[in-house]
């Protein structure tokens, strides 16, 4: 049985894709390996079924929607930060803003400025004490040039001092810029799938409250679309097109 989770897919309509992303904590039940040793020593490892985690998220989900765009399209995105006030106590001031955020459209060749008052492009120059604070909203308007390269890109927070804790929680999504006239897509009847190979790291309480939680704790696992060791089923002769993203902080594939 194929049990690989599929991120929600959204497609542009008449050249426009509109999306509201609510940033907040979400309770998620996830199967994780029973120990750090088990993860490396054997396959498949024993699992802790349905472990309850509290993770920062977009719209209450692990991984954000996959956005399907075409060259010339416009993406309109509202990011609503509904997180509580940031935890304090770090000796480094830049690490006391873990619940402020922003948005980076990774790899897109688009305007990086504040395009006009209150309308932002791929704007990631916020200092740690700026960005989208808890309770605030930011509107992004991303216009793809008509000659924009097709391929897979991704979007994620990029606020210095807070990025790792948020991306480690699953705050990321794919952007696929596709050409409807692509002869490869037109010539093969195939299933297209997005695969996030991601290292989830949480503390003993199942949270990623601080930078240290997202870097130094062994309680976690490598996941594929939020699932631990899922099964992918293919028929003989079947063709699938896999779009693979590694949103982990330190781990190459």
Where in the sequence are the language-model features?
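Histidine-centered copper-binding motifs that mark active-site loops
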Residues: 1-253
């Amino acid at each position: 049985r194929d049990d690989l989770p599929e991120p929600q897919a959204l497609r542009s309509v008449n050249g426009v894709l509109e999306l509201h992303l609510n940033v907040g904590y979400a309770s998620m039940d996830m199967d994780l390996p029973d120990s750090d040793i088990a993860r490396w020593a054997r396959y498949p490892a024993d699992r802790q079924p349905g472990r309850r985690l509290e993770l920062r998220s977009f719209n209450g989900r692990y991984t954000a929607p996959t956005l399907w765009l075409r060259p010339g399209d416009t993406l309109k995105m509202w990011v609503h930060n509904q997180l509580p006030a940031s935890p304090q106590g770090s000796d480094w001031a830049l690490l006391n803003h873990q619940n402020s955020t922003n948005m980076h459209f990774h790899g897109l060749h688009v305007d990086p400025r504040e395009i006009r008052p209150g309308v932002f492009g791929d704007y990631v120059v916020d200092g740690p004490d700026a960005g989208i604070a808890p309770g605030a909203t930011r509107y992004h308007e991303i216009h793809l040039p008509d000659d924009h390269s097709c391929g897979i890109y991704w979007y994620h927070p990029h606020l210095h001092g807070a990025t790792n804790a948020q991306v480690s929680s699953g705050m990321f999504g794919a952007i696929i810029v596709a050409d409807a006239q692509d002869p490869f897509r037109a010539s093969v009847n195939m299933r297209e799938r997005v695969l996030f190979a991601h290292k989830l790291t949480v503390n003993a309480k199942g949270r990623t409250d601080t930078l240290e939680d997202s870097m130094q704790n062994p309680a976690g696992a490598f996941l594929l679309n939020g699932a631990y060791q899922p099964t992918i089923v293919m028929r003989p002769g079947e063709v699938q097109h896999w779009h693979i993203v590694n949103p982990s902080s330190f781990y190459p594939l």
